[in-house]
């Protein structure tokens, strides 16, 4: 989501790679940082979530990747479907294509799991 142009570049120059997305539909890797900054600035840390969620609509990362010339699958919400998707993706990488598998994971803190 940060740079869709990087997806295009990999497709244009035929860079075979596999990206498996840990998609919690949020920028939660930045959550604690936002709280620290809010506290340092004396602002309300309960508002730190603003701009962190990627919901309504949920981005179609597989669709974005396909639009840039990638083979892509997802969003995958059932953990039982991941293994087969990875096999298909690996076959594409072996053919010299970039592949993306979007796995939707549980939101929030704690052990990461598919929903």
Describe each PLM feature range.
Residues 1-115:
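Thiamine diphosphate
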